[in-house]
UniProtKB/Swiss-Prot annotation:
Cross-link Glycyl lysine isopeptide (Lys-Gly) (interchain with G-Cter in ubiquitin) placement: 582
Annotated protein name in UniProt: Lipolysis-stimulated lipoprotein receptor
PANTHER family per UniProt: LIPOLYSIS-STIMULATED LIPOPROTEIN RECEPTOR, TRANSMEMBRANE AND IMMUNOGLOBULIN DOMAIN-CONTAINING PROTEIN
Gene Ontology cellular component list: bicellular tight junction; chylomicron; low-density lipoprotein particle; plasma membrane; tight junction; tricellular tight junction; very-low-density lipoprotein particle
Ranges of residues in domain Ig-like V-type: 89-181
Lineage: Eukaryota, Metazoa, Chordata, Craniata, Vertebrata
Membrane topology, Extracellular segments: 36-206
Protein keywords: Cell junction, Cell membrane, Chylomicron, Disulfide bond, Immunoglobulin domain, Isopeptide bond, LDL, Membrane, Phosphoprotein, Receptor, Signal, Tight junction, Transmembrane, Transmembrane helix, Ubl conjugation, VLDL
């Protein structure tokens, strides 16, 4: 307009009609250097699901395309919470907003408010092809695409609000350069209840859901309880087998049966004679009749006492066979005066009563477990067997071959008897047996009555006088180095021949195979001379007697017949008690209640 006005003013002398025409032409056809801008948003309302992408479109129009504008997206929070108002439509605020919207059709109470009462942030800015995110949205996948479209690749909580699109240009003199779009981000809800990831269940009634939960909880506690009782049976009292540990754990049935029998008096298979009354049907049968038997191998009754260790008999009282009624009267004793109605004292009262009426002379059932249990209960007053030295039992006495012809009180007659009348077998089988350990020690002492006739001559293999070890058995009094003292061959038919000729003869006292040179020696020397042995024993020092003859004993073990079977440590306590019952008295080895 200024150039046209100047042109019109520059021709004052021209025709007035021409000037007016030129001015109108310039005003109409000359371009205006300043133009207006227009910004629009095609979809002002968006609702999306959380973590879903969304794009807010924005377009603008400018008459001057030579200048590149600056696009700015701003975030402003809602003036009012749309979600809260949606759940409470009958509130007072909603009614007031409805009245304002009715009076002013263009009024929006969720958008139109001052910026001072809500949050305002810059989301992104675009100038040319460069996009810059605001400080709050750094790291988010947000960009401006197209002319001015704002794109969210993944929405998040807090993105709900009003987004304003503003276009700024240096030649923008008039027009609307700003528009807004609302965005609401909601959480995702499945159409059907999802119990597990990828597993959906249909609609379920509330009461049915409660029943299912209760049953599942009951089964869980039952399984845990059973497994706990089986793995730790001492902490609870359940007796149901559990499949989780069938090999490691089992129910304490024996303890349960014993406790039930002790409280109710019913006979139990675990302890029938201790904790329960003996019913007539369960009374054990009487012991079998004892057949009187003579002394073994023809020895008198006092031979075992003479041949015991030390030559002395153990004068201890043995068990007396008394009547059970008398024993029950004598064993009344002290008794706990407990209240039988009290369940906690019934077991103790019943056990005290049974122990008071218990008679050791009454034979019990042949049950190894019961016998071992009885020994544990009745041996409380004895000394600890571990502190006592172990003592081997006395061996069975063996009959001497010359017992009928010689008395034990006259050993000299054996020496004076001619050798032709002595039994065959040499010096070892023809001598009398020792009656005690003291007699064995006298063999080694020179000048004793036993040394001249019971000691074999020294062996030529050893360079010293032979001193036999301290014998633990009457069968070990042979000299393994003397060829005349060796037993016969171990041929089993030889023993049968000996028994057929003389039933009383002891096969262990017979001589083994004889050397032909010994026969000639006996023909030249018909009688044994003990003076040579006495002279050899006088030269032996006292220290030689205490030497350990372990090697000689090992050699002797392979030359003699097998010894009797040793005492078994697995014998029960009741077996030892029955062996100690003798002469109608209670032995000190027996168990005392």
């Amino acid at each position: 307009m200024a150039p046209a006005a100047g042109a019109c003013a520059g021709a004052p002398d021209s025709h007035p009609a021409t000037v007016v025409f030129v001015c109108l032409f310039l005003i109409i056809f000359c371009p205006d250097p300043a133009s207006a801008i227009q910004v629009t948003v095609s979809d002002p309302y968006h609702v999306v699901i959380l973590f879903q992408p969304v794009t807010l479109p924005c377009t603008y129009q400018m008459s001057n395309t030579l200048t590149v504008p600056i696009v700015i997206w701003k975030y402003k929070s809602f003036c009012r919470d749309r979600i809260a108002d949606a759940f409470s439509p009958a509130s007072v605020d909603n009614q007031l907003n409805a009245q304002l919207a009715a009076g002013n059709p263009g009024y929006n109470p969720y958008v139109e408010c001052q910026d001072s009462v809500r949050t305002v942030r810059v989301v992104a800015t675009k100038q040319g092809n460069a996009v810059t995110l605001g400080d709050y949205y750094q790291g988010r996948r947000i960009t401006i695409t197209g002319n001015a479209d704002l794109t969210f690749e993944q929405t998040a909580w807090g993105d709900s609000g009003v987004y304003y699109c503003s276009v700024v240009s240096a030649q923008d003199l008039d027009g609307n350069n700003e528009a807004y779009a609302e965005l609401i981000v909601l959480g995702r809800t499945s159409e059907a209840p999802e119990l597990l990831p990828g597993f959906r269940a249909g609609p379920l009634e509330d009461w049915l859901f409660v029943v299912v939960v209760c049953l599942a909880s009951l089964l869980l506690f039952l399984l845990l309880g059973i497994c706990w009782c089986q793995c730790c049976p001492h902490t609870c009292c359940c007796y149901v087998r559990c499949p989780c540990c069938p090999d490691k754990c089992c129910c304490p049935e024996a303890l349960y049966a014993a406790g039930k029998a002790a409280t109710s008096g019913v006979p139990s298979i675990y302890a029938p004679s201790i904790y329960t009354h003996l019913s007539p049907a369960k009374t054990p049968p009487p012991p079998p009749a004892m057949i009187p038997m003579g002394p073994p191998y023809g020895y008198p009754g006092d031979f075992d006492r003479h041949s015991s260790v030390g030559g002395h008999s153990s004068q201890v009282p043995l068990l007396r066979d008394v009547d059970g009624s008398v024993s029950s009267e004598v064993r009344s004793g002290y008794r706990i005066q407990a209240n039988q109605q009290d369940d906690s004292m019934r077991v103790l009262y019943y056990m005290e009563k049974e122990l008071a009426n218990f008679d050791p002379s009454r034979p019990g059932p042949p049950n190894g477990r019961v016998e071992r249990a009885m020994s544990e209960v009745t041996s409380l007053h004895e000394d600890d067997w571990r502190s006592r030295p172990s003592r081997a039992p006395a061996l069975t006495p063996i009959r001497d071959e010359e017992w009928n012809r010689h008395s034990p009180q006259s050993p000299r007659t054996w020496e004076q008897e001619p050798l032709q009348e002595q039994p065959r077998g040499g010096w070892g089988s023809g001598r009398p047996r020792a009656r005690s350990v003291d007699a064995l020690d006298d063999i080694n002492r020179p000048g004793s009555t036993e040394s001249g006739r019971s000691s074999p001559p020294s062996s030529g293999r050893r360079g010293r006088a032979y001193a036999p070890p301290r014998s633990r058995s009457r069968d070990d009094l042979y000299d393994p180095d003397d060829p005349r003292d060796l037993p016969h061959s171990r041929d089993p038919h030889y023993y049968d021949d000996i028994r057929s000729r003389d039933p009383r003869a002891d096969p262990r006292s017979r001589q083994r195979s004889r050397d032909p040179r010994d026969a000639g020696f006996r023909s030249r020397d018909p009688q044994y001379d003990g003076r040579l042995l006495e002279e050899a024993l006088k030269k032996k020092g006292s220290g030689e007697r205490r030497r350990v003859y372990r090697e000689e004993e090992e050699e002797e073990e392979g030359q003699y017949p097998p010894a009797p079977p040793p005492y078994s440590e697995t014998d029960s306590q009741a077996s030892r008690e029955r062996r100690l019952k003798k002469n109608l008295a209670l032995s000190r080895e027996s168990l005392v209640v």
